[in-house]
Amino acid sequence: MLNVLWWLITVEALGLAVFPLAFYLLRRLPDRGFSVTKPLGILLVGYIAWILGALNIVPAIRVSLIVIVLLVASVSAWVAWTHRVELKKFVMAERRTLIAAEIIFLVMFLGWAMFRSYDPAIDHTEQPMDFAFFNASIEATSGQ
């Protein structure tokens, strides 16, 4: 259960860190990208870490991930500061939409965590191979 909480905290933090970027880049969407900030945060940090690791610029270790998250959050904070008035107006005007999107995410996240808790085994379809790749990637310090 503690792992689910850590995943939730991590995903929420990444989503919050990326929201100002999504707000600026996805301005044509009705929610200004709020509903995609969580996967966008995971993909952005993961892609940057993968590229930097594959090019042997930085090792693929926890410290590198933390630095990448801080850099992404810094850029996002700068975007938030430069668009703070517009961002504040949007959040105040669309708070019901933002809360609804967050509730939907939490219900789906916790529902899927409960569903997977009934059969957490890695014993069907491609999961054994996925698990092997996952274990190999944990031990690797570069993306090659």
What residues fall within each predicted segment?
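Active-site lumenal/periplasmic loops and adjacent helix-entry segments of GT-C-fold
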Residues: 1, 93-101, 107-144
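Membrane-embedded, hydrophobic transmembrane alpha-helices
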Residues: 1-95
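Short, compositionally biased low-complexity segments
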Residues: 15-17, 105-108
